[in-house]
């Protein structure tokens, strides 16, 4: 990583990409047992962690980040009764 590259990604695009990736890992976990099941959920939580770090690094309102964090967490836990922003 000798060269520095800048790129732009909207908060909405970041959230959408992470939401889709989380949903894919949860979908895969549904057909697995044991270690495979646990690994897919671990990947989903890792995506949530990276999303949280990137969202906080941007200039987004903390209340919006918290609402979306809860939404993504509920996707992982299966309690998705909150709509995304």
Labelled PLM ranges:
Residues 1-4, 81-85:
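Short intrinsically disordered terminal tails
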